[in-house]
């Protein structure tokens, strides 16, 4: 199976970081980051997209699994950026876990 080009995750994350610093009233990301509900709004979206992904898997709908998983990952990136968690930190944690599994 060919390896996916995951640089899109970095590009999307960078756009989210830019929206965090540079407010644009037309930006969905800005609306999420500055919502009156605060972090709860972002948490609601992550929860909503998680449930929709689960339902797509339960329904064995490949197209919907891809679509809802993309929504979930996007909203998770917003959540990470809002909490100053970098993709490098996530990659480092995953690498450390992978190395530990190889040793066990």
Curated annotation (Swiss-Prot):
Pathway membership, UniProt = Amino-acid biosynthesis; L-histidine biosynthesis; L-histidine from 5-phospho-alpha-D-ribose 1-diphosphate: step 2/9
Q: What domain of life does the native source organism fall in?
A: Archaea
A GO CC annotation recorded here is: cytoplasm
Instruction: Name the keywords, alphabetized.
Output: Amino-acid biosynthesis, ATP-binding, Cytoplasm, Histidine biosynthesis, Hydrolase, Nucleotide-binding
- Reaction it catalyzes: 1-(5-phospho-beta-D-ribosyl)-ATP + H2O = 1-(5-phospho-beta-D-ribosyl)-5'-AMP + diphosphate + H(+)
Keyword Plastid assigned to the entry: answer is no
Main localization category: cytoplasm
GO MF annotation list: ATP binding; phosphoribosyl-ATP diphosphatase activity
Q: What is its EC number?
A: 3.6.1.31
GO terms in the biological process aspect are: L-histidine biosynthetic process
Its subcellular locations are:
Cytoplasm
Membrane spanning segments where?
Answer: none
- Keyword Amino-acid biosynthesis, does the record have it? yes
Q: Which Pfam families match?
A: PRA-PH (PF01503)
Task: Give the similarity note.
Answer: Belongs to the PRA-PH family.
Q: What protein am I looking at? A: Phosphoribosyl-ATP pyrophosphatase
